[in-house]
Amino acid sequence: MEFLGTTQTASYCGPKKCCGLTSLPAVQAPVIQECYQPYYLPGYRYLNSWRPSLFYKISNVQTCPDESSSTLRPPTTLPALRSALFSRYSPHDWDQSNQLQVRGAEASRLWASRLTDDSVRLLQDKDQLTQQMQQGTTRNLGQRLSDIGFWKSELSYELDRLLTENQNLETVKRRLECAANEVNCPLQVALECLYHREKRIGIDLVHDNVEKNLIREVDLLKCCQQQMRKLAQRIDLQMRDNRDAQHALERDLDDKSSAQCIDEKCFNLRNTSDCISFFHGMEKIDGTISVPETWAKFSNDNIKHSQNMRADSIRLREEAEHLFETLSDQMWRQFTDTNLAFNARISEVTDVKNKLQTQLAKTLQEIFQAENTIMLLERSIMAKEGPLKVAQTRLECRTWRPNVELCRDVPQFKLVNEVFTIDDTLQTLKLRLRETQDMLQLLVMTKCRLEHELAIKANTLCIDKEKCMGMRKTFPCTPRLVGHT
């Protein structure tokens, strides 16, 4: 039997038999402050099964059934002393544990001192950071107000120019409408001239230069009217686009004014202001729909769109002024050409009428002479009948001569020759009488035709000179043709 107190070569210091002990229960992680790291004492003989610590509870050890009871050799030590012998430390472990405690305390104090210094510095840094952030935000709000003011001035300037351009465009539109209505008067005059000239008679219904100029004048006036009205319609559409651009500028300007009021209110807020309060979660809500680039681009696009609309309006106004100048010049030139054609035609008709009157006078003279000639021929024929009767009577009487006295003597020969001569003379005179009568009939017909032609020419002169030229004495002046009333 071995006694207590022997060396470690004793049987109770030999290899420990497996007793089938259950493992320690799992412990819950302790709730400790940040940066705290638990430490443990060194030593392989450290037993958590019986020694309580700061973070573990004493676990109940369930002993396993004695497996050695079945062996023949009894235990060499008492069970009550075995746990006490196994739980003892060496002096080295004790010293090392004390040193660790001291070093742990010094580390804790050093960490606490550093934490205190870091906390002071953190407070100073965070106060300075908060103040700098607030000052920076205030500066940003001021810069934002400056940007808003800049774009407001740009939008206001562009809006004023657009409104002025709209007024100018409205004036040009009214001028176009007035000029188009003013063309109705000369157009009606030209149409009336064409209607009156349709009342010409006979050969005077000619497609002359006057009619060509009148048709060109009507077409030109209608074309001018159509061009003015089309341009007025284009200007009306442009004015709609201008109003859209104007509404966009006004909306943008109103939004900028509202944003400026809000940002001015935010700019003037201080830590001591009465109207400040907590609005938790506002930093997590992103209700923005633009960034500074797109924000500036939006206003810039509105201004560029307005500038494009103004450029289109200026081009339309220049086109309208050019159209006024061109059309008024064309209408005046065509009106003058038509009047010149009228004057030339009236002169031609007057010349022809004078010639016809001259021919009529000569025809009447020829008729008078023909009638005298007929009268002389009739008298001459009647005068030749007496000698013919005498000659024929003489021949008839000489036929009663008896027998050989019926001689073809010189008197007989002369009488026969006289009868033939007088008869031939009568036939010639009668033929000339018929020719003269035919000529007289022709002259009478010519006189009728001349009188008819003179009546036609008089009607033509009345239409062209009195009716048409009477209406064409006046023409709208240039200021009225360009829309100035």
Curated annotation (Swiss-Prot):
InterPro entries in the record: Tektin-like, Tektins
Domain of life: Eukaryota
Keywords: Cell projection, Cilium, Coiled coil, Cytoplasm, Cytoskeleton, Flagellum, Ubl conjugation
Post-translational modification summary for this protein: Ubiquitinated, leading to its degradation. Deubiquitinated by USP16, promoting its stability.
Chief location category: cytoplasm
Quaternary structure and interacting proteins, as annotated: Microtubule inner protein component of sperm flagellar doublet microtubules. Interacts with TEKT3.
Name this polypeptide is given: Tektin-5
Native organism: Macaca fascicularis (Crab-eating macaque)
Gene symbol of the encoding locus: TEKT5
